[in-house]
Swiss-Prot record:
GO terms for biological process: ribosomal small subunit biogenesis; rRNA processing. An accessory protein needed during the final step in the assembly of 30S ribosomal subunit, possibly for assembly of the head region. Essential for efficient processing of 16S rRNA. May be needed both before and after RbfA during the maturation of 16S rRNA. It has affinity for free ribosomal 30S subunits but not for 70S ribosomes. This is Ribosome maturation factor RimM. Residues 103-182 form the PRC barrel domain. It comes from Yersinia pseudotuberculosis serotype O:1b (strain IP 31758). It is found in: Cytoplasm. Belongs to the RimM family.
Length: 182
């Protein structure tokens, strides 16, 4: 692991993945990618992690696909014990590296915290997570405390045009055509 002062800590950090369990005894780790194509995580460099509230630059020595997993070798991490210290560390990059999106496409990070409101004005709650289901993405919406339907959370498909009627990231608001009782 590099302890260099450069490269600079990201101004706009975003989580692109997470380091998983160790693999073998030579310091390799599984890595879980949040990018659409799992291997694309390696296109974004430099990587940073946070340990004990401090940013650390992580330099990759190597990576490879092993069965269904991606595994990485971090420079300076040469045994299982050292690799164990990195288990469950989130991998950050500067979000300015991410490509510009087409109209009606959004990064999940930008949707987090948005208020979800039906076309009739009923406030469903706030987006707390997003899930990929294969056919479409799904918003996990934490219901407001006094939800009239007694819901704690809702799963609302992110289908632009069908369910999603309007996204206003400036106002942190997503308008949906969705039955609040569902």
């Amino acid at each position: 692991m590099s302890k260099q002062l450069n490269p600079a800590v990201p101004d706009q950090p975003i989580v692109l993945g997470k380091m998983g369990s160790t693999y073998g005894i030579r310091g390799w780790l599984r890595v879980f990618s949040s990018t659409e194509n799992a291997e694309s995580i390696f296109d974004y460099q430099p990587w940073f992690i946070q340990q004990a509230g401090k940013w650390q630059h992580v330099e990759l020595e190597d990576w490879k696909r092993h069965s269904q997993d991606l595994i990485i070798k971090v420079k300076g991490v040469d045994d299982r014990d050292a690799a164990n210290l990195l288990t469950n560390c989130e991998i950050f990059v500067d979000s300015t590296q991410l490509p510009a999106l087409e109209e009606d496409d959004y990064y999940w990070k930008d949707l987090m915290g948005c208020q979800v409101v039906t076309t009739t004005g009923y406030e469903l709650g706030k987006i707390i997570d997003m899930m990929e289901t294969g056919s479409n993405d799904v918003m996990v919406v934490k219901a407001n405390l006094k939800d009239a339907f007694g819901m704690k959370e809702r799963l609302v498909p992110f289908l632009h045009g069908q369910v999603i009627k309007k996204v206003d990231l400036t106002a942190q608001r997503v308008e949906v055509d969705w039955d609040p009782g569902f």
